[in-house]
């Protein structure tokens, strides 16, 4: 069980889960391994106890534990039944529940048979999109969890943001650590871009060797357990080649933010000599590559994003993009490097938009591209991302697609260096770091 003194609040997610407390739907927390799902369940149990719920009303089961290794859906049901307290409402917390075969039968029975409130976590999307949808007929709420945002990274690493006067008469933001050492906010952001946002990094400190060990463990668990072992348990054996899986993973990591044709990936890997193996014959088919990519998407290692034709008002089927769930994992796979930082910060912005509740797509207008169209209910936001707006050529490149859009929704350009102007004909130029730490 997690030691509670190590827990730090993730209010974005805790508030979401509290909002659905004591409602009928099963609360399902999804996300990549080690992004904080178990800690979120523990935080929820602490919240319950603070509001008067007693220990005997709470049942916690983490199916990563050897104690539950051979549990079936029948023994799962009987175990829970034995812990029911008569005439009291029960609160069930099931961590990585998908490791129990036919778990959904048992969970659905708990919902029907007992006076209970159910919370579960899972590290693959297959459990939610397939079995769960069938057995619970929509009676579930998904809380999608991600690694730390930049704002959370500051909190987890005990940085405090303070505003100080700048030489030009304005203000600038600096980060102070718990030893009262101060850093430019950009320095801390560079650390975030290097180490990523996995919560475990905060436990070991910003140490590159230790970070690589932690990230290697996450990668190995996702690839070996969540993908290869899961495929074997399903009996389908669609994803069986760990070398091909790693090469596709590295290819996608190296090409975040690029338009990708699935049919070309196999040829690219072969042409670059990345699949040299005397036992492997031919080029992986587009179907095989897509199957492997789907497995990576189901494990929340990558997220895909589709293109939207702004004038035609329809989604396009080809040349979507992929973003990696944590930039630290990308650095683990490819090595720490400074090049391609533009796509890396684009990656950060994409996930920040998801955290803020937006549905995100790529915008196409004529032969130009808008980095992101972010939609939420009746709201829409067009976003361009670039490292600097100081060059006239860059300003033209980033502003022209937005200027072509004929509607009144907000349009912004996010950059690390905004230049002197804060607005261009109604298009806002916003400092990326200010935006990331804003509400």
Task: List the predicted regions and their residue ranges.
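Pre-Walker A adenine-sensing motif
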Residues: 4-22
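Hydrophobic anchor at the beta1->P-loop junction of P-loop NTPases
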Residues: 29
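Conserved lysine of the Walker
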Residues: 37
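Hydrophobic positions on the alpha1 helix immediately C-terminal to the Walker A/P-loop
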Residues: 40, 44
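Short glycine-rich substrate-engagement loop in P-loop NTPases that contacts/grips substrate
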Residues: 59-88
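Structural recognition of the conserved hydrophobic beta-strand(s) that form the central parallel beta-sheet
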Residues: 117-123, 144
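Interdomain motor-coupling "hinge/lid" segment immediately C-terminal to the ATP-binding subdomain
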Residues: 131-254, 258
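Accessory nucleic acid-recognition modules appended to NTPase machines
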Residues: 203, 208-379
């Amino acid at each position: 069980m997690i030691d509670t003194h190590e827990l730090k609040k993730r209010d974005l997610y805790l508030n979401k889960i509290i909002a659905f407390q004591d409602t009928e739907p099963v609360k399902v927390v999804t996300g990549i391994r080690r992004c904080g799902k178990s800690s979120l369940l523990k935080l929820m149990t602490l919240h319950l106890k603070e509001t008067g719920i007693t220990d005997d009303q709470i049942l916690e089961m983490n199916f990563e534990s050897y104690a539950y290794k051979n549990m079936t859906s029948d023994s799962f049901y009987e175990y829970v039944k034995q812990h029911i307290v008569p005439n009291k409402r029960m609160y069930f917390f099931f961590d990585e529940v998908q490791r129990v075969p036919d778990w959904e039968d048992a969970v659905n029975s708990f919902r029907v048979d007992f006076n209970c409130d159910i919370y579960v976590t899972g590290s693959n999307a297959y459990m939610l999109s397939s079995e769960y949808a069938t057995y619970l007929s929509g009676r579930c709420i998904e809380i999608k969890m991600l690694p730390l945002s930049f704002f959370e990274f500051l909190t987890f690493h005990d940085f405090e943001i303070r505003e100080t006067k700048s030489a030009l008469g304005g203000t600038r933001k600096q980060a102070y650590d718990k030893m009262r050492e101060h850093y430019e906010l950009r320095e801390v952001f560079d650390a975030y871009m290097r180490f990523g946002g996995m919560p475990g990094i905060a436990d070991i400190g910003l140490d590159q060797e230790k970070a690589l060990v932690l990230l290697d463990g996450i990668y190995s668990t996702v690839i070996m357990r969540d993908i290869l072992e899961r495929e074997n348990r399903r009996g389908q054996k669609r994803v069986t080649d760990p070398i091909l899986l790693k090469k596709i993973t590295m290819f996608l990591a190296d090409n975040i933010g690029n338009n990708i044709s699935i049919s070309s990936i196999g040829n690219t890997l072969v042409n670059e000599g990345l699949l040299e193996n005397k036992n492997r014959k031919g080029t992986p088919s587009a179907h095989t590559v897509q199957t492997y990519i789907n497995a990576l998407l189901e494990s929340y290692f990558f997220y895909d994003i589709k293109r939207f034709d702004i004038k035609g008002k329809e989604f396009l089927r080809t040349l979507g993009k992929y973003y990696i769930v944590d930039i630290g994992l990308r650095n683990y796979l490819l090595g720490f490097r400074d090049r391609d930082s533009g796509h890396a910060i684009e990656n950060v912005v994409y996930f920040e938009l998801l955290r803020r509740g937006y549905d995100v797509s790529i915008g196409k207008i004529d032969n130009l591209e808008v980095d992101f169209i972010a939609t939420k209910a009746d709201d829409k936001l067009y976003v361009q991302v670039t490292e600097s707006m100081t060059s006239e050529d860059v300003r033209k490149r980033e502003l022209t697609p937005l200027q072509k859009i004929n509607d009144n929704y907000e349009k912004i350009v996010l950059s690390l260096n905004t230049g002197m102007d804060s607005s261009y004909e109604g298009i806002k130029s916003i400092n990326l770091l200010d935006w990331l730490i804003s509400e």
